[in-house]
């Protein structure tokens, strides 16, 4: 019987025959409210950025410190999104794929290959490669993760100013106990994803 190996992923080796790689990642598949946000980043190999790591493992302070450096040093970066209405129409998986397509299409320089965090690649006009735990293994994906996370968090903070009773700045729209209590008390706004089960239940749809 084989010895169970630790879940350590090997260092990523960039495929040969390609020059420009875009890293792509998403933030916000799980929340009940707001857009699913994706980012695409092409880094400059001659201008490396120290301290890139998966955005979820970095402190907010570190993410905010890295953001301007990524934007300044990257050859190109872009944000793509899908709205709650689009998520309800398409489903969250398809909406995430569309948001990734939009992020890549928005790059001022088009890559030879898109490196996508996860296990699915959207339909693209260039080569694409899905990389499990890519946000930990590939600098371009880490940079995309940081941009997407900061953008979405800031949008939740803005939404919190409009609707402070929901506590968006704290839970960022994710399904927490405090969030459910706020929905039970105040209902939902147009920013909610009405196809998500907890929201359907509150609205009496399901």
Curated annotation (Swiss-Prot):
UniProtKB keywords: Cytoplasm, Endonuclease, Hydrolase, Manganese, Metal-binding, Nuclease
Record-annotated RNase H type-2 domain positions: 19-206
Reaction equations catalysed: Endonucleolytic cleavage to 5'-phosphomonoester
Residues involved in a divalent metal cation binding: 25-26, 117
Cofactor comment: Manganese or magnesium. Binds 1 divalent metal ion per monomer in the absence of substrate. May bind a second metal ion after substrate binding.
GO annotations of cellular component type: cytoplasm; ribonuclease H2 complex
Primary residence: cytoplasm
Cellular location(s): Cytoplasm
Keyword Transcription: no
Cofactors named for this entry: Mn(2+); Mg(2+)
GO biological process: DNA replication, removal of RNA primer; mismatch repair
Molecular-function annotations in GO: manganese ion binding; RNA binding; RNA-DNA hybrid ribonuclease activity
Protein EC: 3.1.26.4
Cystine bridges: none
Alphabetized Pfam families for the sequence: RNase_HII
Membrane in keyword set: no
Chain segments annotated as coiled-coil in the UniProt record: none
Family: Belongs to the RNase HII family.
Cited function: Endonuclease that specifically degrades the RNA of RNA-DNA hybrids.
NCBIfam families: PRK00015.1-1, PRK00015.1-3, PRK00015.1-4
Protein name: Ribonuclease HII
Species the sequence originates in: Vibrio atlanticus (strain LGP32)
Gene that specifies this protein: rnhB
């Amino acid at each position: 019987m084989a010895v169970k190996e630790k879940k350590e992923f090997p260092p990523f080796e960039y495929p040969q025959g390609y020059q420009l790689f875009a890293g792509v990642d998403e933030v916000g598949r799980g929340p009940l409210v707001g857009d699913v946000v994706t980012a695409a980043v092409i880094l400059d190999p001659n201008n490396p950025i120290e301290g890139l790591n998966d955005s979820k493992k970095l402190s907010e302070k570190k993410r905010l410190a890295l953001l301007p450096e990524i934007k300044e040093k990257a050859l190109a970066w872009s944000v793509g999104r899908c709205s709650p209405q689009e998520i309800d129409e398409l489903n969250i998986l398809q909406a995430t794929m569309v948001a990734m397509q939009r992020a890549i299409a928005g790059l001022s320089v088009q890559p030879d290959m898109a490196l996508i965090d996860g296990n699915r690649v959207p339909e693209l006009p260039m080569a694409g490669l899905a990389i499990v735990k890519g946000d930990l293994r590939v600098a371009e994906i880490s940079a995309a993760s940081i941009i997407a996370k900061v953008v979405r968090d800031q949008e939740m903070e803005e939404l919190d100013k409009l609707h402070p009773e929901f506590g968006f700045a704290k839970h960022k729209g994710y399904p927490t106990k405090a969030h459910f209590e706020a929905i039970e008390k105040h209902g939902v706004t147009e920013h909610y994803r009405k196809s998500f089960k907890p929201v359907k239940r509150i609205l009496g749809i399901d």
